[in-house]
Amino acid sequence: TANRRQRQMCIRDSYIKKRIEKDYKILYTGELGRSAHEMIIDCRDYKEEYGIGVMDIAKRLIDYGFHAPTVSFPVPGTMMIEPTESENLDEIDRFCDALISIKAEIITCTKDDTHNILKNSPHTLETLTSEVWNHNYSRKEAAYPLSYLESNKFWPTVTRIDDAFGDRNLICTCNPIEDYIKS
């Protein structure tokens, strides 16, 4: 039923909150410090101190095998996490582990360093296997920051793009519609 699903989502959200609250500031909690079926993590301070923005975190999550949650809505510089009832505990734990690992990466960055692991994310297979590697971190750190990725890696097909430009200049790379009609 709907009530059962809502309870499950709230339980999952509370679990995630408990796992990551030492590493991320959570906005808009209730009187008892709880969040409902979604939470907003505040990433704004990282920009000033480390030069890392919410989009850098979102792009790095791709290297960990996760599609980035909603960013900068409803609050600019934040990330909204909404676990669904279909996500099992193992997947939620992997997601929390990824966020905690990313926080550890953030604090190694400096404000003026635009050539760090987060700013270069996501890392494609083509990038990682190229002859040239001009980064101050290893290929393993880029591709396999946590051990579960060694046996279950999802590779991004593109590296960092200008999101605003891409949103304004969407170009379909599909075959012409006639090719699909023939088949």
Task: Please identify what each model-predicted range represents.
Residues 12-183:
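Non-catalytic terminal extensions of PLP-dependent enzymes
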Residues 1-11:
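Single conserved hydrophobic/aromatic residue that forms the stacking wall/gate
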